[in-house]
C-alpha cells in the first residue's frame, strides 16, 4: 500500500488528500505525508514543489468526521482544511449532484452531495488532484454488516461481489463528484498490485471475530502511524460521518414532498426499479427530469441493502429482513448509534 501511494503521488499539479478521519483515509493521508518532501517524478532526488500535504474534510458543524480528521491532521502534520456545509446547502445541491453522478441510488446521493460541495471548495483553492480512501471497505469487509458474516467463505464471496460492483457506487461517487469540478481522484487501495495481494490473503484473517473490529488487519498494520483513537474508531459511512442529521433531514425533506398516494403509484410511474421509500422516490423524480429515457433508468443498479450490503448478504441475519436503509446505523447491535 505504501508503494501504491508513492506511485499515485506522481503529479505535476497541486494535490491533496481527502481526510474524513476514518481509518482508510487516515492511512492514505499518513502515507502521503511520508513522501511529500521529495518529487516522485525523479525518484525522490529533488525537493517537491508542494512539500506539505493539504488535507480536506467536510461535515455539518460539529460532525464526527470533522473532529476526527482534525485529530489525524495534527498527528501527521498536514495543512488541514475542515470545511462545513449546512443542510440547506446540501438540499440546494441535490439536483446538480444527481445530474453529475447520473444515479438515483439513495446511499450514493447521500454521500455524493457533501463530497460535491467539498470538491467545489477544493477547486477554488487550486488543488487539481486528490488521493482518496475508497476500496478498503470492499477489500477488507469494513462495512458494519460484515460483523454478521456467518463464515469466512461467505465473507470472502461478499467482498468479491462488492469489488465487482464498486464502479457503480463508491468509485462513481468519488470520481464524478470530483470530476464535476475538474479534480482527479486517485484511489491507492485499488492499485492493482495491492489489490492482488490483499485479495490473496486468507479470508479468515479478515473475518470479524469477537474482540476484533472491522478491518482489524489494517488497524494492526498501521497503528503506529495513527492516533490511537483513530486506529480504534468504528466504521462510519461517509454519509453518516458528515453528521447524523444529514440523512435524517434528507428523509424528512423527501417525506414532505412525496405523498402516500405517490408511493402507491410508484410502480406505474417508474416501472424500472420502482422506489420503495419516499427518499428514493424523490431522487428518482429528479433523475427522470435529467434522464427521461427508460434505458437511462436501467443503467442504475438497484436492490435492497442494509449498511451498503449487496442483496445477497441480507440472508446473513434475521434483523436484515425488514431493513431497507443503506446507512451503517441500520445494523442493529453493532453501530453505537443504531436506529
Model-predicted regions and their roles:
Residues 1-226, 240-255, 263-339:
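ATP-dependent adenylate-handling active sites, centered on carboxylate activation for C-N bond formation
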Residues 228-236:
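A short alpha-helix-loop-beta-strand transition element characteristic
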Amino acid at each position: 500500500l505504501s508503494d501504491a501511494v508513492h506511485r499515485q503521488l506522481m503529479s505535476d499539479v497541486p494535490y491533496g488528500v481527502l481526510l474524513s478521519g476514518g481509518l482508510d483515509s487516515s492511512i492514505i493521508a499518513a502515507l502521503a505525508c511520508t513522501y511529500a518532501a521529495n518529487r516522485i517524478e525523479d525518484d525522490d532526488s529533488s525537493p517537491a514543489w508542494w512539500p506539505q500535504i493539504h488535507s480536506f474534510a467536510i461535515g455539518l458543524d460539529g460532525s464526527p468526521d470533522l473532529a476526527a480528521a482534525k485529530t489525524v491532521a495534527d498527528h501527521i502534520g498536514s495543512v488541514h482544511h475542515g470545511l462545513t456545509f449546512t443542510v440547506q446547502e446540501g438540499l440546494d445541491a441535490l439536483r446538480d449532484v444527481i445530474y453529475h453522478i447520473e444515479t438515483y441510488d439513495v446511499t450514493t446521493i447521500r454521500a455524493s452531495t457533501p463530497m460535491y460541495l467539498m470538491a467545489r471548495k477544493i477547486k477554488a483553492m487550486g488543488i487539481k488532484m486528490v488521493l482518496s480512501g475508497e476500496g478498503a471497505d470492499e477489500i477488507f469487509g469494513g462495512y458494519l454488516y460484515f460483523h454478521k458474516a456467518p463464515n469466512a467463505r461467505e465473507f470472502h464471496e461478499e467482498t468479491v461481489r462488492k469489488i465487482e460492483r464498486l464502479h457503480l457506487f463508491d468509485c462513481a461517487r468519488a470520481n464524478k463528484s470530483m470530476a464535476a469540478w475538474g479534480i482527479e481522484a486517485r484511489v491507492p487501495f485499488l492499485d492493482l498490485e495491492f489489490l492482488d495481494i490483499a485479495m490473496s490473503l486468507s479470508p479468515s484473517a479478515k473475518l470479524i471475530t469477537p474482540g476484533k473490529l472491522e478491518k482489524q488487519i489494517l488497524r494492526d498494520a498501521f497503528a503506529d502511524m495513527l492516533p490511537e483513537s483513530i486506529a480504534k474508531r468504528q466504521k462510519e459511512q461517509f454519509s453518516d460521518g458528515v453528521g447524523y442529521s444529514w440523512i435524517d433531514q434528507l428523509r424528512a425533506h423527501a417525506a414532505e414532498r412525496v405523498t402516500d398516494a405517490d408511493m402507491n403509484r410508484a410502480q406505474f410511474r417508474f416501472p424500472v426499479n420502482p422506489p420503495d421509500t419516499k427518499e428514493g422516490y424523490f431522487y428518482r423524480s429528479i433523475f427522470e427530469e435529467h434522464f427521461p429515457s427508460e434505458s437511462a433508468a436501467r443503467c442504475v443498479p438497484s436492490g435492497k441493502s442494509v449498511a451498503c450490503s449487496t442483496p445477497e448478504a441480507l440472508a446473513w441475519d434475521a434483523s436484515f429482513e425488514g431493513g431497507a436503509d443503506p446507512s451503517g446505523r441500520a445494523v442493529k447491535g453493532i453501530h453505537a448509534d443504531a436506529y
